[in-house]
UniProtKB/Swiss-Prot annotation:
Protein name stated in the entry: Peptidyl-tRNA hydrolase
Highest classification ranks of the organism: Bacteria, Pseudomonadati, Pseudomonadota, Betaproteobacteria, Burkholderiales
Catalytic activity: an N-acyl-L-alpha-aminoacyl-tRNA + H2O = an N-acyl-L-amino acid + a tRNA + H(+)
Matches recorded under InterPro entries: Pept_tRNA_hydro, Pept_tRNA_hydro_CS, Pept_tRNA_hydro_sf
Subcellular localization(s) per the UniProt record: Cytoplasm
């Protein structure tokens, strides 16, 4: 059963619309659905709300530590409420999936994502759930003929807003993720994964 849903992103208005904040977009939607408001909670180093989602009590968190220190926020809340790693779902932007794709998985490496890297270090475990929200990779924007020697600027890419057509399909993928949340919060994660990956 998932007791904590974390969305990753960077704090501040200048980052709100950037690809790296896709995790925040999901949490904002969940809070709206639950009719709750995230509030600044200093002991958890983030914006936090306790929500009732589909009959289950769930903690929602948006770390305000900047991406590469997200673990500090996650572990503070997890320890306070005695939440185990496999009861945590982390929603994050995923370079290795095209915009419009969203996938659930338990465990695994960080794939170069600094937020995941820091969470893994703070939890001393990789065994937490991830909701991977595809944002695409900057190499996909380079014509194939020019890709051979090109070095795409990933840091710049994730800190820019998606193009309009990308934003539309990312929003649609978040809607699909929201549709499986009743299963997620009830602990039916295999079923949720199958449904999400079918689409």
């Amino acid at each position: 059963m998932i007791k904590l849903i974390v969305g990753l992103g960077n704090p501040g208005a200048e980052y709100t619309a950037t690809r790296h904040n896709a995790g925040f977009w999901l949490i904002d939607q969940l809070a709206r659905e639950a009719g709750t408001t995230l509030r600044d909670e200093r002991r958890f180093h983030g914006f936090y709300a306790k929500a009732r989602l589909h009959g289950e009590e769930v903690h929602l968190l948006e770390p305000q530590t900047y991406m590469n220190r997200s673990g500090q926020s996650v572990v503070a809340l997890a320890q306070f409420f005695k939440i185990l790693p496999d009861q945590i779902l982390v929603a994050h932007d995923e370079l290795d999936l095209p915009p419009g794709t969203v996938k659930l998985k338990l465990g695994g490496g960080s794939g170069g994502h600094n937020g995941l890297k820091d969470i893994t270090a703070h939890l001393s475990s990789q065994q937490y759930w991830r909701l991977r929200i595809g944002i695409g990779h900057p190499r996909d924007l380079i014509p194939e003929s020019a890709r051979a020697g090109a070095k795409p600027d990933v840091a710049n890419f994730v800190l820019k807003p998606p193009r309009r057509e990308e934003q539309d399909v990312i929003d649609a993928s978040i809607e699909r993720a929201l549709a499986v949340m009743p299963m997620v919060v009830k602990g039916e994660l295999d079923r949720a994964t199958m449904q999400l990956h079918r689409n």
